[in-house]
Design a protein with these regions (language model features):
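Glycine-rich phosphate/diphosphate-binding loops that line cofactor/substrate pockets in enzymes
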Residues: 14-17, 56-58, 173-181
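Flexible loop/turn segments at secondary-structure boundaries
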Residues: 28-32, 71-76, 152-155, 192-195
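Extended hydrophobic packing segments that form well-structured cores
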Residues: 131-203
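Conserved small/polar residues in nucleotide/adenosyl-binding loops
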Residues: 204-210
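Generic recognition of flexible, low-complexity loop/linker segments
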Residues: 5-12, 50-54, 131-134, 171-174
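Accessory "access/gating" subregions that flank catalytic or transport cores
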Residues: 1-41
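Structural motif
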Residues: 20-24, 64, 185-186
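C-terminal catalytic subdomain
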Residues: 40-145
Length: 212
C-alpha cells in the first residue's frame, strides 16, 4: 500500500520548483460540509496540499487560495472546534502545537462525547489531529493568502493573510516573498476526488519544450 500511495501521490521525475501555488477551497469536501469554512479544518486542508506538493514547492513558496470563509463552523459535525478556535486566540497560544496540553480535557468532555456517540459528530480529539496536521502549512510556506473571505478576521485568526482579489494577493506575494517572476502552479481541481498532483505536473511536463 505504501508503494501504491507513493506512485499515486508523487511524481519523482518532477524537477521544477514552484514559488506560488493557486487553488480553491470549496465549502464541502474531505471531512464534510464546512471543511472549507471552519478555520481549523481549513488549516488541515491547506496542510494536505503541503503534504501532496512539498517536493515541488520552492523554499519561498506561497499559497493563494480562494475561500468564502464565511464563519460557517458546522457545529453539529464538529461541536468542539468553535471552542478550540476561541481558545487558540488567547492564553499565550502562538502556534497550533501550543494547544496540545488541552487534548485530554477535550477528549474526555462529556457533552462532546455524547454528540460523538449519539448525534453523528466527530470525536473531540479529532480536532487535535486536525491541528497537528494544520501546523504543517505554517511550517512549509512563506505565506498563505485567503482570497474572497466574507469573514476575513476568522482567517487572520489562524495566521493567514487576506486579500479581496487574486490580483492583490499575487502582487503582495511578489513584492514580499517571490520576486517579480515567480513560477506559478494553478490547481483548478484541487478538491476534486480525482485530483492528483501528477496529472498537472504530467501535463506541464508534456507541454514544456525539451531542453537540450
Amino acid at each position: 500500500s505504501w508503494k501504491t500511495a507513493d506512485k499515486r501521490t508523487y511524481v519523482h521525475w518532477a524537477e521544477k520548483k514552484y514559488d506560488i501555488i493557486v487553488f480553491g477551497m470549496p465549502t464541502n469536501f474531505h471531512y464534510g460540509n464546512g471543511m472549507g469554512t471552519n478555520p481549523i479544518q481549513m488549516m488541515q486542508a491547506l496542510s494536505a496540499q503541503v503534504i501532496r506538493h512539498r517536493r515541488i514547492m520552492s523554499d519561498r513558496c506561497v499559497f493563494i487560495v480562494s475561500s468564502i470563509c464565511d464563519g460557517y463552523f458546522h457545529d453539529e459535525r464538529w461541536p468542539y472546534l468553535r471552542e478550540l478556535y476561541d481558545l487558540f486566540q488567547h492564553d499565550y497560544m502562538n502556534i497550533l502545537p501550543d494547544m496540545n496540553r488541552y487534548g485530554e480535557y477535550f477528549a474526555t468532555k462529556e457533552e462532546y462525547i455524547r454528540k460523538y456517540r449519539f448525534a453523528n459528530a466527530f470525536h473531540p480529539f479529532h480536532g487535535f489531529s486536525m491541528m497537528s496536521c494544520g501546523h504543517l502549512a505554517e511550517e512549509h510556506t512563506s505565506a498563505i493568502y485567503i482570497v474572497g473571505a466574507r469573514e476575513p478576521g476568522i482567517a487572520r485568526g489562524m495566521g493567514l493573510k487576506t486579500r479581496a482579489t487574486f490580483e492583490e494577493a499575487l502582487a503582495d506575494a511578489m513584492r514580499k516573498y517571490t520576486g517579480p517572476n515567480p513560477n506559478i502552479l494553478a490547481l483548478p481541481r484541487t478538491a476534486s476526488p480525482r485530483e492528483l498532483a501528477e496529472i498537472y505536473l504530467s501535463l506541464i511536463h508534456i507541454s514544456e519544450p525539451t531542453r537540450p
